[in-house]
């Protein structure tokens, strides 16, 4: 009886895999509402990861792939996000004070209520990133450089006059 059941199960699994049905993909990392001060997430594939309301002060996320990630309300004081891919990421209500965004690609990210204070944005690409006028004005005051990935000027990507 057990052999018959095992054989039937094996046959069903073989049939499913031959039809293109695969096991479920691993879920994206979720570290929301965590204290991650000084954490090292550099050069990692963090696509779709969730860092909502996490404290990432002094964290190193440089060179990481954060496409589609959610950093809603994250505290990113003095964090290193240089060279990160933040396309289509949610940054709304994040606090970026002293944050390094050099050469980051933020194209299509949502950052309307994000606070940018004393940030480094040399070479960052902000194409199609909605943000408040006061934040845009402060970023335009320090915008310079060309993004090495997209070839866009930081000033142009922000729409600075």
Regions found by a protein language model. Name each.
Residues 2-9, 13-161:
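Tandem repeat scaffolds
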């Amino acid at each position: 009886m057990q052999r018959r059941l095992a054989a039937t199960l094996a046959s069903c699994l073989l049939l499913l895999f031959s039809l293109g049905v695969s096991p479920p993909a691993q879920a994206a990392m979720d570290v929301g509402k965590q204290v991650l001060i000084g954490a090292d997430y550099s050069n990692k594939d963090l696509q779709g990861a969730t860092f909502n309301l996490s404290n990432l002060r002094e964290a190193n996320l440089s060179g990481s792939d954060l496409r589609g990630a959610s950093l809603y309300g994250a505290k990113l004081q003095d964090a290193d996000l240089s060279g990160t891919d933040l396309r289509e990421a949610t940054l709304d209500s994040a606090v970026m004070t002293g944050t390094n965004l050099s050469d980051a690609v933020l194209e299509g990210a949502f950052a309307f209520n994000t606070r940018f204070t004393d940030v480094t944005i040399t070479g960052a690409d902000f194409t199609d990133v909605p943000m408040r006028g006061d934040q845009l004005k402060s970023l335009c005051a320090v915008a310079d450089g060309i993004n090495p990935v997209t070839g866009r000027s930081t000033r142009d990507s922000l729409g600075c006059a």
